[in-house]
Amino acid sequence: PDVTKAKEKDFRATFEIKGKALYPQMKILFAMMREILMESRLDDEKRLKEILAMLKSRLQMSFQSSGHTTSALRALSYGSPLSKFKDDTDGIGFYEVVRGIEEHFEEKKAELIQNLKQLSRQIFRVDNVMISYTSSEDGLTPIEAAFREIKDTLYPELDGEETPCVLHCRKRNEGFKTSSKVQYVARVGNFIDHGAQYHGALQILKVILSYDYLWQNVRVKGGAYGCMSNFNRIGEGYLISYRDPNLKKTMEVYEGVVDYLKNFTVDERDMTKYIIGTISNIDRPMNPAAKGDRSMNLYMNHVSQEMIRTERSQILHAAQEDIRALAAVVEAMLKAEQICVIGSEEKIEEEKEMFLEVKTLF
């Protein structure tokens, strides 16, 4: 996963291996992790080719079922090094790499094996490891010894300083053609880059847009299967549609969010319902694994208890004027003019003047 400083846009990429086990099987779990990290055969050409074909197929299936999140991530990658890294490791950018290697495996297999071995030595180092462990007090006793066994088998520290990886972003505004007859339409941007600030009421806005404006205009009137939005602490925001028969019409709906918010008026009962809906999303019951993931993510992303309390207070005390004030945030997001659409060849060709690049996805 990525690790982002919540008040900044710096990020550190991490490689994660995780598992669950009953207490008597903890030694077996850690032994399996150690074997996977340190003893995997990275030079098995036959197996590598099989994995590449499997990855290519799975990514294509993912783009068809989750094209809305894929297009949003791709659009965000035009202006965010963090999102570009995500796209390069789990999005369209990654798919293009996998496809290129799989289709020219004989020419590229030696370089692939060399890169995998080099990455393993750089990542699985004794000075580069962190563990997050969730259990009852009874389960804490064996963890130190088990962790020490893994740590003792990792690669040694690297000599000299590491060279930072610099990711270059550029606006591409792509339309990706597929055999599908529906579109996944994304409009994104970083509102902090364009002068706005994060506020807890943006979490309420997600609920309002999903159940009112976007629902009525994209789903009910437009015929899309779904629509959603998101806004995070580092300023990234998006508006997306799911299995949408439209393209240009949906983009026009996104542009209308600003005027909708400027004129936002509801009665106190509806406002309370929006707040309750927002809090219910935040206060979901969590099993131990979910609690462990959340605690690690908050720690690694430098999200303090004070930041959580502030956001919660802003949500609970939000009024209609706070929602109307968010028009400036959405307007700032739209100023980025970053779009990406995955959809039918016919629809994308019909609106090709909207894009900087039009290409076939698969």
Indicate residue ranges for each PLM-predicted region.
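Prokaryote-biased recognition of long, low-complexity C-terminal linker/tail segments
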Residues: 148-202
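Active/ligand-binding-proximal structured segments within catalytic/core domains
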Residues: 31-34, 197-209, 218
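Charge-rich, well-structured scaffold segments of protease-associated domains
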Residues: 1-164, 221-362
